[in-house]
C-alpha cells in the first residue's frame, strides 16, 4: 500500500475516471500538483491504454485548474520512472509544476537540468 492510498478525497482538487489530483505537500512552486493513478501501479509504463488516454484528460483538467486558481500559463510536466530517475514513491504520479517569470535565473533547458550540468546545449 502506498502513501497515496491514505490521501482523503477531501484533499482531491479534481478527479477523472482513473486519476485524482492533489497539491504537492512539498511544492517546488505555488500550485505544484500531483496527478495520481487510482490504481496502484509502479510507473507510467504500467498504466494500461485507457489510463494513458485518461492521463491526457487529467493533465488538461489540471492545467485548467491551475490557470484559473493561480493565473499561470507555463508548466513543467514530469514523471520519475525508476529509482535512478529519482522516483521515491513507487505509485504512478505525474508532477505538474507551474512556472513563473523569475522563479529561476535562466529557465532555458527546463527538464534537461534533471542531470546537473547537462542541461545547456548552446
List the predicted regions and their residue ranges.
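HIT superfamily nucleotide-processing domains
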Residues: 1-122
Amino acid at each position: 500500500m502506498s502513501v497515496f492510498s491514505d490521501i482523503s478525497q477531501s484533499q482531491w482538487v479534481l478527479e477523472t475516471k482513473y486519476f485524482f489530483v492533489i497539491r504537492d505537500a512539498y511544492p517546488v512552486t505555488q500550485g505544484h500538483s500531483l496527478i495520481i493513478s487510482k490504481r496502484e501501479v509502479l510507473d507510467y509504463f504500467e498504466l494500461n491504454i485507457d489510463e494513458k488516454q485518461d492521463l491526457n484528460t487529467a493533465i488538461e483538467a489540471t492545467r485548467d485548474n491551475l490557470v484559473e486558481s493561480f493565473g499561470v500559463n507555463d508548466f513543467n510536466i514530469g514523471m520519475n520512472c525508476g529509482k535512478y530517475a529519482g522516483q521515491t514513491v513507487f505509485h504512478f504520479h505525474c508532477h505538474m509544476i507551474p512556472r513563473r517569470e523569475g522563479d529561476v535565473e535562466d529557465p532555458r533547458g527546463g527538464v534537461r537540468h534533471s542531470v546537473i550540468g547537462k542541461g545547456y546545449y548552446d
